[in-house]
């Protein structure tokens, strides 16, 4: 399963990759956390 995820943000504060699944966790400077 391939899913395209897109969001507009000026800056990303943190980025983390899941070791076994194709997931990316991002924390944005506006306080939003997205998986």
UniProtKB/Swiss-Prot annotation:
InterPro entries: WD40/YVTN_repeat-like_dom_sf (IPR015943). Keywords: Hormone. The keyword Zinc does not apply. Gene3D superfamilies: YVTN repeat-like/Quinoprotein amine dehydrogenase. Gastric, duodenal and jejunal mucosa. Circulates in the blood. Seems to be confined to specific endocrine cells. GO terms for molecular function: hormone activity. The keyword Manganese does not apply. Xenin stimulates exocrine pancreatic secretion. It inhibits pentagastrin-stimulated secretion of acid, to induce exocrine pancreatic secretion and to affect small and large intestinal motility. In the gut, xenin interacts with the neurotensin receptor. Oligomeric complex that consists of at least the alpha, beta, beta', gamma, delta, epsilon and zeta subunits. Interacts with SCYL1. Interacts with JAGN1. Interacts with TMEM41B. Interacts with SVEP1. Probably interacts with PEX11A. This is Coatomer subunit alpha. It comes from Canis lupus familiaris (Dog).
């Amino acid at each position: 399963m391939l899913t395209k995820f897109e969001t507009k943000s000026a800056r990303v504060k943190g980025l983390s990759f899941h070791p076994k699944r194709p997931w990316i966790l991002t924390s944005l400077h506006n306080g939003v956390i997205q998986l």
